[in-house]
């Protein structure tokens, strides 16, 4: 019998547009979209909720979108910025688990089955993650919590935007029975229409059918429909992300300008960094961590980092870096301080010992 899992699906709300509104708050209440121009025969990558009131949606041709919403503000895709923010989101995920399966820049599965934070509650963990994303990055995320991947994904869409929906193990059967087949990942308009022609509207309808009926009509995907309709999804969260660094950062309660205040914050973060290194890299001694980094975020939300190789991993070397990077402040107050180390490459014998 498979171990009962706790899976969270995080889906950022209109991610690209949300990042653009964060960068330029004047856009917040205006219909905006990110995508290609009419001249490029482009399509919308995403749009904010004011734009969606006009019927706009992702993948809509830009020309059509402008006809529906003549006042639409169209912004070009800034993929460098979105990747940067996506990385920051993933760093929040890593506070709870390393078992992360990114689906895109704004969407990921997390397996928190063995997580000890929040008393092991996947619901509380999901809420903490959403709160951290909002407080630290000024973005909203929706979350779905369930024991199966496909249900976690469906759940994250239930209370969008900025919501959470939980399906406990005991609720799976009832939830699946009434679930419209159109909600199943991969069931588009064409497949949905074919299912309707067969008299199948919900997963409960499929439960009355023999598997061979769906196999004959839809091939291998028919098996997937049948399994999901019976609450079966044995796929595990697959993490292909190789961790390259360990870090800790904190948004301050009040902005600071004095270097001595920065050192106090560094002193507070340093032992937390040590704990995270021990947890993330238990087989690597501290003396091998020599590439150290300090990160600052200013009151204007600009971020700067300074990384240097040191003779050894110790508190004093981080303070040296902090004093150097503090000179980049240029009169701006500091709202966040962070520390990080680059994980050294393992020696051949250490790599072999893993097998």
Curated annotation (Swiss-Prot):
Top-level taxon: Bacteria
Family according to the record: Belongs to the DNA polymerase type-Y family.
Domain (UmuC): residue spans on this chain: 7-188
Transmembrane segments: none
This protein's name: DNA polymerase IV
Location of the active site: 107
EC number: 2.7.7.7
One annotated Gene Ontology cellular component of this protein: cytosol
NCBIfam families, sorted: PRK02406.1 (NF002677)
Cofactor notes: Binds 2 magnesium ions per subunit.
Binding site for Mg(2+): 11, 106
Stretches assigned to coiled coil: none
Organism expressing this protein natively: Mannheimia succiniciproducens (strain KCTC 0769BP / MBEL55E)
Alphabetical UniProt keywords: Cytoplasm, DNA damage, DNA repair, DNA replication, DNA-binding, DNA-directed DNA polymerase, Magnesium, Metal-binding, Mutator protein, Nucleotidyltransferase, Transferase
Function summary: Poorly processive, error-prone DNA polymerase involved in untargeted mutagenesis. Copies undamaged DNA at stalled replication forks, which arise in vivo from mismatched or misaligned primer ends. These misaligned primers can be extended by PolIV. Exhibits no 3'-5' exonuclease (proofreading) activity. May be involved in translesional synthesis, in conjunction with the beta clamp from PolIII.
Subunit field text: Monomer.
């Amino acid at each position: 019998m498979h171990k009962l899992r706790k899976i969270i699906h995080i889906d950022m709300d209109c991610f690209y547009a949300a990042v653009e509104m964060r960068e330029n708050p004047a856009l917040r209440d205006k219909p905006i979209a990110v995508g290609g121009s009419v001249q490029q025969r482009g399509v919308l990558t995403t749009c904010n909720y004011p734009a969606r009131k006009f019927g706009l949606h992702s993948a809509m041709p830009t020309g059509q979108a402008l006809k529906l919403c003549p006042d639409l503000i169209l912004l070009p895709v800034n993929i460098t910025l979105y990747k940067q923010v996506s990385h920051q989101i993933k760093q929040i995920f890593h506070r709870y688990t390393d078992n992360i399966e990114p689906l895109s820049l704004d969407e990921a599965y997390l397996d928190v089955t063995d997580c000890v934070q929040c008393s092991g509650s996947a619901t509380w963990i999901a809420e903490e993650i959403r709160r951290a994303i909002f407080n630290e990055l000024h973005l909203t995320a929706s979350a779905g919590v369930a024991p199966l991947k496909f249900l976690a994904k469906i759940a994250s869409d239930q209370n969008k935007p900025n919501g959470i929906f939980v399906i406990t193990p005991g609720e799976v059967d009832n939830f699946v029975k009434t679930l419209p087949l159109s909600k199943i990942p991969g069931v588009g308009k064409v497949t949905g229409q074919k299912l309707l022609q067969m008299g199948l509207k919900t997963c409960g309808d499929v439960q009355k059918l023999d598997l061979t009926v769906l196999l004959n009509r839809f091939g291998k995907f028919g098996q997937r429909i049948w399994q999901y309709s019976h609450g079966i999804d044995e796929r595990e969260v697959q993490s292909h992300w190789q961790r390259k660094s360990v870090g800790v950062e904190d948004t301050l309660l009040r902005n600071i300008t004095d270097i001595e205040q920065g050192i106090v914050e560094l002193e507070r973060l340093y032992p937390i960094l040590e704990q995270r290194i021990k947890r993330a890299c238990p087989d690597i001694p501290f003396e091998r961590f020599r590439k150290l980094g300090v990160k600052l975020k200013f009151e204007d939300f600009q971020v700067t980092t300074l990384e240097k190789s040191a003779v050894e991993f110790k508190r004093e070397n981080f303070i040296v870096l902090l004093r150097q990077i503090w000179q980049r402040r240029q009169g701006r107050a500091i709202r966040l301080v962070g520390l990080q180390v680059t994980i050294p490459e393992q020696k051949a014998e250490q790599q072999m010992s893993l097998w």
